[in-house]
Amino acid sequence: MKNYLLQIEYFGRNYCGWQRQSHSPSVQEELEKALSKIANQNIEVTCAGRTDTGVHATSQIVNFYSDAERPLSAWQRGVNALLPQDIKILAVQQVDNNFNSRFTAINRTYNYIIYNSATSSPIFAEHCLWENRELDIDKMNQACEYLLGEQDFSSFRSSQCQSNTPFRNIQKAEFIKQGSFIVFEVVGNAFLHHMIRNLVGSLLKVGLGFESPEWIKVVLEAKDRTQAAETAKAHGLYFVGVEYPEFSFKRQIIKLFC
């Protein structure tokens, strides 16, 4: 039995998220269906981060076990031929049998993309959040400083979150402006359900001048979801990287745009 690692890219608009669902299309279901056909046996996959409905990935990492003797090209080109156009395998390699894409991961990186312009873009409308009002990135980055380290993120956790603990360790949270795009890059050991989108929704209030940077600290300490802002839309969020002890994978979405 061999263990294979796949680097996956997908556009999440047409899916209920990563995780297999009984009555809705999912990325996991499409991938497992294609892999199983190539392997001529049932294949189940594990992913580094389970993305929500409408969320995308430029570098999702997946692993699966199979005793089917296939060249690596079959696991990539062969499977890609069976996958829909909005899901593709970028790379494949054999890894140690102890490797687990979820539990071996040290941290995960997400990008949230905001198109900050007076006029919306027909090209980027489905790829990022449009905000026509000017955002104060300096204040947003001041607010981000309160997010760093291991903390209780109950205020930014959805009511459907099934995690046993609200504590997460954030190593990086930063807004970067590139032309009309503003990229929120956040790196953490793991994330709660809707956590990043809830953070973005609140940080936008700071950027628009409705709240001070210190307000984020107050919301964190409240440990109450009702104290934070509304959830930012899913289509601006991208899973872009994973770090493991032996290697890392990262494809920043903004570099694909520019």
Curated annotation (Swiss-Prot):
One Gene Ontology term of the molecular function aspect: RNA binding
Record-annotated membrane-spanning stretches: none
Root EC class: isomerase
Gene Ontology process terms (BP): tRNA pseudouridine synthesis
Description of how the protein assembles with itself and partners: Homodimer.
Family: Belongs to the tRNA pseudouridine synthase TruA family.
Function description: Formation of pseudouridine at positions 38, 39 and 40 in the anticodon stem and loop of transfer RNAs.
Name of the molecule in the record: tRNA pseudouridine synthase A
